[in-house]
Amino acid sequence: MLSDFYKYATSTQLDLICTQLINLSTHVFNTNNGNIPKWEQAIKQIKTQNTGSLDFITPYLNISAHHINNFTLEKSLKQLIPWRKGPYQIGDLQLDSEWRGDMKWHRLIPHIKPLKDKVVLDVGSGNGYFTYLMAISGAKIALGIEPFLLFNYQFQAIRTLINNLPNVFVLPLSLDKIPKKPLFDTVFSMGVLYHQKDYELHLNQLKDVMKPSGELILETLIIDLEKVKKIIPKGRYAKMRNVYCLPSKNTLRTWLEDAEFKNIKLLDVTKTTSKEQRATHWIGNNTQSLKNFLDPNNRDLTIEGFPAPKRAIFICQK
């Protein structure tokens, strides 16, 4: 996969940084992680399956492979649980992930600049579900970065099954490892900001890698309460660790203004429902999901007593 990335990246402005990214990624893949043999064995088994062409048939990223052995494929893919982002369909096997990513995609795609021929970065890409959608939408190259190693192997598993591979890649890197060069036309940061101890640093790091007039799509948890500027959870939020700050819409707009982004627009605010986030048999033995994270007596509150999750999507330009 890294050799393919080199081949495609060198035909774009990412030529300036691709060798550095490959060296960093190689180092991560060579780390001593006891799960890697299991993950690599799963991918080895997946490679014995027939491949198919990739397209998007709502809600699924669909791989139209024929004569798939559903039993062995499902068994191999479940060696890579939990599957958070998706859903995917391979032949007639439906990989119903915890999140219905298509719902978020449909909320934002009509409003952003066309991705055709763009160099696109997907920060915190997970297994690459959205990164694939960016590539299908015509990106010259769509690069996801995801430091959690398992999700990189999930990406490779899906990639193994595709015979019309678009220019899409996921590397096991965090945003701070991307050189501060203005190379990306469009940058997505979705579900990342609230996990940052330093939101200003994150916004500035995003800006550093964007071309002049490049577009940022920022999706994050917010607080939608009158006269409340932000909430800093002590402990967990909706049973999530490392949630550092939930801003109001106006506070988030101010943060973007302070970072000197321009043309700031709020596209959408949506309360997360169990239609979009739910437990499935693809998330493993820990079958808790949104309904378990909310107060059973008041679904407008989390189990900790905070307002239930709402997510906002902003777009802006450098």
UniProtKB/Swiss-Prot annotation:
Reaction(s) catalysed (UniProt annotation): carboxy-S-adenosyl-L-methionine + 5-hydroxyuridine(34) in tRNA = 5-carboxymethoxyuridine(34) in tRNA + S-adenosyl-L-homocysteine + H(+)
Top enzyme category: transferase
4Fe-4S in keyword set: no
Keyword hit for Metal-binding: no
EC number: 2.5.1.-
Binding of carboxy-S-adenosyl-L-methionine, residues: 85, 99, 104, 124, 175-176, 190, 194, 311
Keywords: Transferase, tRNA processing
Pfam families per the UniProt record, alphabetical: Methyltransf_9
InterPro entries in the record: CmoB, Mo5U34_MeTrfas-like, SAM-dependent_MTases_sf
SUPFAM superfamilies: S-adenosyl-L-methionine-dependent methyltransferases
A GO MF label: transferase activity, transferring alkyl or aryl (other than methyl) groups
One of the GO BP terms on file: tRNA wobble uridine modification
Job description of the protein: Catalyzes carboxymethyl transfer from carboxy-S-adenosyl-L-methionine (Cx-SAM) to 5-hydroxyuridine (ho5U) to form 5-carboxymethoxyuridine (cmo5U) at position 34 in tRNAs.
Record-stated family: Belongs to the class I-like SAM-binding methyltransferase superfamily. CmoB family.
Subunit structure: Homotetramer.
Protein name per UniProt: tRNA U34 carboxymethyltransferase
Species for this entry: Ruthia magnifica subsp. Calyptogena magnifica
